[in-house]
């Protein structure tokens, strides 16, 4: 019994529009080369909040709050063909998207 090979792709970005465009580009490339795609699965967002003092010296009650939201997506490519792997290696994604690939 042969074990099927899967490729798991995790994408992270601060801007969800860029992330969704990159995800759609990967899905279209994989489907065009004959692979089956599971996903994109939206993963929970990571929200980091920072509180800083407005003034440099006194007035502790005056503060600013900032946050960074990290959006994540998960893709599984089931039984990829060699053409799929080549197409994914040559794919040029937008700047600001972090890609992690596990085979």
Curated annotation (Swiss-Prot):
Keywords: Ribonucleoprotein, Ribosomal protein
Listed GO CC annotations: ribonucleoprotein complex; ribosome
Molecular function terms from GO: structural constituent of ribosome; tRNA binding
InterPro entries linked: Ribosomal_uS10 (IPR001848), Ribosomal_uS10_dom (IPR027486), Ribosomal_uS10_dom_sf (IPR036838)
Pfam family, one: Ribosomal_S10
Signal sequence, start to end: none
Alphabetical GO biological process terms: translation
Keyword set includes tRNA-binding: no
Function of the protein: Involved in the binding of tRNA to the ribosomes.
Family label: Belongs to the universal ribosomal protein uS10 family.
Subunit structure: Part of the 30S ribosomal subunit.
Alphabetical list of NCBIfam families matching this protein: PRK00596.1 (NF001861), rpsJ_bact (TIGR01049)
UniProt protein name: Small ribosomal subunit protein uS10
Gene: rpsJ
